[in-house]
């Protein structure tokens, strides 16, 4: 098995099967598009276990992803997909960049979930783009854009209900999708506190990577508490 790709949080390896890949979660955490970076032992284990549980939960609700199975504390097998270079962001509550970009007060609840697209390009700092931009860049066509929006909205509905059972609020999250060789679009990458903004219902305490971004707590303790809540369901 050979290393195919190494990103900020994961390594991707080939397997003996052409359409199956092995993903290894790293003990690294970054913020600000890599401007802040640290090695934190145990983080890979937590992200792998959380993502595996959430992908299995989504599958049970009829929402498929590239995920096949967890094979170790830090590894999982996934179906090979060509990643679509978009971050699909769903916002239920105003926080983060949208408060600066559009002036919403932090904590403002949107009447309906807001779906945004960001172009995955480190050199351009992952800019917000429109549906017309997506077509102009030949990233996806009209039908695929609608599928991405519909899938993101369905995933959001399931995750909001899941977090509610954990006494948490899903503020926002970002997800990625990929195409199979047959052209099917599947949820890919990960869903974890690295990719979500999650608040405690009573205290608004963060259960996500903001504790690292803002130096307000231990990322390991925060993620472990989140996993404990997930396992308790």
Swiss-Prot record:
Pfam families: SAICAR_synt. It comes from the Bacteria. It catalyses: 5-amino-1-(5-phospho-D-ribosyl)imidazole-4-carboxylate + L-aspartate + ATP = (2S)-2-[5-amino-1-(5-phospho-beta-D-ribosyl)imidazole-4-carboxamido]succinate + ADP + phosphate + 2 H(+). GO terms for biological process: 'de novo' IMP biosynthetic process; cobalamin biosynthetic process. Gene3D superfamilies: ATP-grasp fold, B domain, Phosphorylase Kinase, domain 1. The keyword Mitochondrion does not apply. PANTHER family: MULTIFUNCTIONAL PROTEIN ADE2, SI:DKEY-6E2.2. Belongs to the SAICAR synthetase family. This is Phosphoribosylaminoimidazole-succinocarboxamide synthase. It comes from Staphylococcus saprophyticus subsp. saprophyticus (strain ATCC 15305 / DSM 20229 / NCIMB 8711 / NCTC 7292 / S-41). The lineage of its organism: Bacteria, Bacillati, Bacillota, Bacilli, Bacillales. The gene is purC.
